Amino acid sequence: GMKGSYLSMSGRDAVFSATSSDSGNAGTVTFDSGEWYAGKIVIDIEGEVAYDKIAFEGKFNKTGNINDMALEFVFDGYSMNEFINANGGEFTLSDVITYETGSSMEGTVFEGNTNGFAWEAVFGDTALSVTFTVPEPAEISALLGALVLAIAIIRRRK
């Protein structure tokens, strides 16, 4: 993959992707170190093992405010649904962005929803781990079930 010395993301409208965000190819890019002040990182997910990876051999530091940062995931909804179902209701990518211990990105958490798939991205000790789930249908059916039960109880009391 590509190799760079230092990645500095600082523009609020800046977008970075390991491959061009519209190429439909997943790839890896490696940097010695980097910092994230603002802007968006786009991760392309092609498969369970084929997805964009950003590797920092050294530290990856948060130098700005999380409100100016964003993560975006690009994937095929049908495939993502398959990955989630095949993995017991959630699909996790554990090494999307890797870095050295002691990086100030550690502890940063992003949450979002892409095409109906909820995701949580957690920057841990040495890597970003992203978990995808499909919360909506289960929550909706639980609410409908509770509503039907409540109506049945009310009718029985009459």
Region annotations inferred by a language model:
Residues 51-52, 93, 139-142:
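Intrinsically disordered, low-complexity segments enriched in glycine/proline and serine/threonine
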Residues 1-90:
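Extracellular beta-strand/loop-rich repeat segments of large surface/secreted proteins
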Residues 40, 46, 63-134, 147:
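Extracellular/surface-exposed low-complexity segments
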Residues 3, 16, 20, 28-29, ...:
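Short stretches within intrinsically disordered, low-complexity N-terminal or propeptide regions
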Residues 136-154:
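A short, hydrophobic C-terminal helix/tail in secreted or cell-surface proteins
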Residues 5, 27, 55, 115-117, ...:
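Residue-level detector of intrinsically disordered/flexible regions characterized by low predicted structural confidence
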